[in-house]
Amino acid sequence: MARKALWAKSFLKEPKFKTRKHARCPLCGRPRGYLRQFDMCRICFRERALRGEIPGVKKASW
């Protein structure tokens, strides 16, 4: 299945059992690397953090 079809299928249809539900990024539809705290995948999180769109988040440096 195409990525858009999987995304639409996961957002529109509720699974029969709660354990079957898999979190997806609402911005790009990516099923892996999902950060619950920010409700997006790691790639979208990184892009927005570097642009300064997520308050209180900055790139680590040590």
UniProtKB/Swiss-Prot annotation:
Zn(2+) binds at residues 25, 28, 41, 44. Signal peptide: none annotated. Binds 1 zinc ion per subunit. Its cofactor is Zn(2+). GO terms for biological process: translation. One of its GO terms (cellular component) is cytoplasm. One of its GO terms (molecular function) is zinc ion binding. It comes from the Bacteria. It holds the Pfam family Ribosomal_S14. The keyword Lyase does not apply. Keywords: Metal-binding, Ribonucleoprotein, Ribosomal protein, RNA-binding, rRNA-binding, Zinc. The keyword RNA-binding applies. Belongs to the universal ribosomal protein uS14 family. Zinc-binding uS14 subfamily. NCBIfam families: PRK08061.1. Part of the 30S ribosomal subunit. Contacts proteins S3 and S10. Binds 16S rRNA, required for the assembly of 30S particles and may also be responsible for determining the conformation of the 16S rRNA at the A site. PANTHER family: 30S RIBOSOMAL PROTEIN S14, SMALL RIBOSOMAL SUBUNIT PROTEIN US14M. This is Small ribosomal subunit protein uS14. It comes from Persephonella marina (strain DSM 14350 / EX-H1). The gene is rpsZ.
